[in-house]
Amino acid sequence: MNGMVAAPQPVAAEEGVLALRRGGNAVDAAVTAALVQGVVDPLNCGIGGLGGMQIYRAESGEGIFVDFFSSVGAQATPDLWVDQILGPAVDGVGFILRGDLNEIGYQSIGTPATVRALSGALSRYGTWSWEEALAPAIAWARKGYPIPAELARDWRVPYAEG
């Protein structure tokens, strides 16, 4: 299959390309790359995060969005923290709240959906088994990998707001 794979860390992209070379389709490659990315750069793309996957099925012209955004508790409402907002986060993602309510404590917890969504996308639109897609990530976790400079820096810096 012709194709290309993009990922923040080269090793993840390379594993996605290998998935294509081994006969996998685009979803097999994307899931494989995502799982490897979660191992080699866990602060940016880990299985505890959130996101989405867009799939285009050329044979049917169908566009599909696989949602893996975290779920919150049943008592959460859209205006839950409106009166607690101090301002936008320095990095432009989200907001800083009084008492770090969205970062620390029980109210900050969302149920990650990444594993469920990747597994579901693979079983519905892929051709590989979960075990085949997960194998490269397991291999990288076992043998180790070079830590990117940004990750090493993040691990050394104490928590700061925003």
Task: Explain the meaning of each model-derived region.
Residues 1-14, 18-21, 26-162:
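Noncatalytic scaffold domains of N-terminal-nucleophile
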